[in-house]
Amino acid sequence: MKKILIFILLLFSFNVVAISKETTFTNDIFEKSQLDGKTTVIHSWNKTCTTCSRQAKILDKAKQEFKDVIFLSFEQTKDKNIAKFLSIDYWTTIVVYRHNKEISRSIGQTNKEKIYSQINSL
């Protein structure tokens, strides 16, 4: 009985951490956003990564506040072709592009103010 209880607790704890996101990045959306001069935020994540989950919550709030910004994401270990295209080697990477230029990049950042500053960077 004790082993079953421990198994259930461990299973539940992993489900709490899991991100229920889907890949929203496509080359077409990214290229169009850059041609239109839009600020584009790209988040690389993994569904079992706690840091990624914290970043996703901050970026979900940012979507509500930054109406003119395009937010795209992808699962880094699953979508390796996207990671290679964007030169992203790590989960927890947030990259901001504007006018076909990379404006800023961070890895592991979970501070809301710093992420918002990254989005606003020129």
Walk through the language-model features, giving the residues of each.
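Sec-dependent N-terminal signal peptides
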Residues: 4-13
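N-terminal leader/targeting and pre-domain segments
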Residues: 10, 17-37, 118
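Short active-site neighborhood of thiol/selenol oxidoreductases, capturing the structured segment around
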Residues: 35-47
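Typically the conserved alpha-helix immediately C-terminal to a functionally engaged Cys/Sec
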Residues: 51-65
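Non-catalytic, surface beta->alpha helical segment in thiol-disulfide oxidoreductase systems
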Residues: 98-122
